[in-house]
Structures are given as structure tokens and as C-alpha cells.
């Protein structure tokens, strides 16, 4: 084993350096292309006349995979919920605390739809 390492140390080191450089280049490319991709998506919305999908009825499903282990909602899920209906902001303000954690009274709604009637049934709060 020592003979193998002695003979191939340079190649192993070169492979490690190559992987490190690849990761650095990949991260730099992602950083540079993300704003460009977002701009092109917005431009496509303008050209096609399309826009983000909006639901006609307020409500979303609060799934367990949208939450961390400590019941904190992921930022990307919150952004998605907020983008699909204007009333979702009120729903999220009611069911999440200041740390974006689902309040204990609403944890029984995980896996179900969140709308005005389920919030009223769970806590008595009228939205």
C-alpha cells in the first residue's frame, strides 16, 4: 500500500486539486448565471404575455417536507405560497411565528389544506 501511495501521490494530489478547481469554477458560474437566468425569465414573461401562476381560490397544502425538523418553513416554500395568491400572506402571518415556525395550535393542520375555514376551525381566528 505504501508503494502505491509513493508512486501515485502526484496523481492523487492532481486529482484532488482538479476537483477543487472544478468546484470553485462551478460555484462561480452559478453565481454569475443566476441573475441572468432570472432576468431572461422575466423578459420571457413580458414577451409572451404570461406571468406567474395565480390560483383563483386561496389555500395551500402544508406538507411536512415544506418544514424543517423543528417546524420552521423553508424560505423557498414561503415564497412559492406567497406567489400563488394574495391572501396567503394573511394565512402565513397567522400560522407562522416570527421565526417562521408553525405555531403549536396549527401543527395538527400539517398534511392538510390551509385556508380560512381550516384556520378558523383550528384556532377560532377569523381571516
From Swiss-Prot:
The keyword Membrane applies. It comes from the Viruses. GO terms for cellular component: membrane; viral inner membrane; virion membrane. It is found in: Virion membrane. Keywords: Capsid inner membrane protein, Membrane, Virion. This is Protein P6.
